[in-house]
């Protein structure tokens, strides 16, 4: 009964920050993820706008008590249609953007709220039933995002703002500096922590852990010839271990 009362009090407690602060955190995360994906300042700006748009609409849908499945469908749609319109306008203006980076940024923002990592953590810590439920939920919501993106592509084609063919090779990053890309990871992690109403000490710890992983990846492992798969795995283990110890 005591535990149930504590949970009820936590659920009824007001958030520590206003809603616009959370939206700003998501925008910061979207801007930073665009940098990590190789975008420039314009792509970063579009990523921030897209993230804010997705979260604002999802917040409104949450107030209407719509299931989160539909949040993912609409979020995938909103990640695609604006990027197609931005691409069409940029082409007419004589400049260029990479719409796939904007779409990927929106997808990352949506995936950040899923429970895949939590399901794996439950499995590792001996809670297989909860892990199975959360894993199925993550798969279901991922399918909803894919459906939203597919629908957005079809609508963009109908509006005459079709997307370019997908490149088989990722574009050259606009910022090659290991420090800049590491800081992109720092701002992405800190933005997400702020978006989910973490306290200031938790945000600082999140940023420090992200810098440890990002700097190790971009400044140590990759320059010395480590494979991307091994580097990603090692940094993920480092971040997970550091986060667990700090928590």
Identify the role of each PLM range.
Residues 2-247:
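Alpha-helical transmembrane segments and their membrane-interface boundaries
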């Amino acid at each position: 009964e005591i535990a149930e009362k504590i949970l009820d009090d936590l659920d009824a407690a007001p958030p520590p920050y206003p809603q616009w602060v959370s939206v700003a955190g998501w925008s910061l995360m979207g801007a930073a993820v665009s940098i990590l994906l190789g975008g420039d300042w314009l792509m970063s700006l579009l990523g921030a706008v897209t993230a804010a748009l997705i979260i604002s609409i999802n917040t409104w849908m949450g107030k209407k008590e719509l299931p989160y499945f539909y949040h993912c469908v609409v979020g995938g749609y909103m990640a695609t249609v604006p990027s197609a319109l931005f691409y069409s306008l940029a082409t007419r203006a004589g400049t260029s953007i990479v719409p796939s980076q904007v779409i990927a940024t929106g997808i990352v923002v949506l995936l950040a709220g899923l429970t895949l990592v939590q399901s794996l953590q439950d499995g590792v810590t001996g809670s297989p039933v909860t892990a199975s439920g959360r894993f199925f939920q993550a798969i279901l919501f991922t399918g909803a995002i894919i459906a939203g993106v597919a629908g957005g592509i079809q609508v963009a084609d109908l509006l005459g703002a079709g997307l370019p063919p997908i490149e088989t090779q990722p574009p050259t990053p606009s910022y090659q500096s290991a420090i800049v890309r590491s800081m992109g990871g720092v701002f992405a992690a800190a933005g997400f922590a702020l978006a989910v109403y973490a306290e200031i000490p938790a945000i600082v710890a999140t940023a420090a852990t992200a810098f440890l992983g990002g700097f190790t990846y971009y400044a140590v492992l990759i320059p010395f010839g480590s494979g991307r798969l091994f580097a990603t795995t090692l940094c993920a283990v480092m971040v997970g271990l550091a986060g667990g110890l700090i928590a």
